[in-house]
Amino acid sequence: MLFKHLVPEANLVHHVSQRYFIMGAITRSNKSGLKTAENTSQVYPLATDIPTGIKKPKSNGVSKPKPKTKSKPIPKAPKNPSPIIDATDASIKKQTKVEPLEVPLDLTLPQEFLDYHTPGFIEGVKYCIERDPSLHPIIVRENFTGFGSKAFDEKLAKADDDRIHLYWYSLVRSVIAQQVSGAAAKSIEGKFKSLFTGGDDGVIPTAKATLDMSEEQLRSVGLSRPKVKYVQHISQVFANSNEKLTSLDFYRSATVDEIYNELCKLKGIGLWSAKMFAIFTMEELDVFAEDDLGVARGMAKYLEQRPHVLQRAKEEVANDDSKQTALKKRSKFYNKLDSKRTWKPIHDVYVLHIAEKFKPFRSAFMMILWRLSLTNIDVLDKE
């Protein structure tokens, strides 16, 4: 379970990858533009947890062919990128403070690892290994459960039919899970779904049916007053066919930053939440949340073992006036004199600069940093 800001860091474990919802991505354009927003915490459901089977409007007897769902093209990585760390045992030992732990000379991934994950995620981790071969052991230690190809394939088959409904439910479920334990979130979600038993839509929660619920009914399942407002607003937007977030054409034509803008207009959804939605629901391969505590801690541990990488980043940033100006601002995470942290936060400017070396697969790099952020790596993904 992932919590932000409201729980002790010792108990903060980034396991978003076990509780989100995956479906086929949509091909989009590459324009840019970004609006900032406040962070909120959320957890995304597994594909098997999403209610499906919405009653469709009766047809007039004329069937229309269903458009084929297009998978998002995997971005092309730069040709022959210079490695951050050379792909040799001697170099890994020299440039890091860890043993290489059986890094194969050809940097291949185990077949079972390849079979488990989606093609896009595999390309992402391959690129990360190409940039830094010393990441190989941490990558292959466990599967990244949020990027399993089976769940991806099952959802891809009917993605366009239920996509907007699933987008709505994923966002509502993220609000339910904000600032509560995993057990509490599961309990509240179960009670929320039980509200719809016996309704016109059967047991399937929908945006329209949610709007028909009174505030008292929604409060009765354990939602706070602010969360009730968030759920109602998200449902109001997704019940309106004229809204951008209910249009598949919008998701196909908009850039990820433009989608962030629309998501951040929803009550209860901030930029951090929008980025998690982009990674785990839309399967974006180049998302990076530098303001995430797990990312900050993972980067600190990554650089603690690779001090020359930080030194090189500082030298490169020194030649960039805009980044030098940004360095004058206080970093998102910093240690106070009485801090009990066992790790030293790195300034956001350096975190972003180093992450840029893993474009266009920063989502995979972020998952690796989350894994590195765990004090006891053996408990990873075994909650």
Task: Tell what function each PLM region has.
Residues 3, 17-252, 317-319, 323-334, ...:
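N-terminal polyanion-binding entry modules of DNA glycosylases/AP lyases
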Residues 9, 15-18:
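Intrinsic disorder/low-complexity segments, especially N-terminal tails and targeting/processing regions
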Residues 164-165, 169, 251-255, 266, ...:
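Residue-level marker of regulatory loop/turn positions in helix-turn-helix DNA-binding domains and
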Residues 167-170, 211-213, 275-278, 344-347:
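Surface-exposed beta-strand-to-loop junctions
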Residues 176, 254-303, 364, 370:
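Catalytic DNA-binding helix-loop module of base-excision-repair DNA glycosylases/AP lyases
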Residues 198, 236-244, 265, 279, ...:
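Alpha-helix capping at helix-to-loop junctions
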Residues 280-355:
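Phosphate-backbone recognition surface of nucleic-acid-processing proteins
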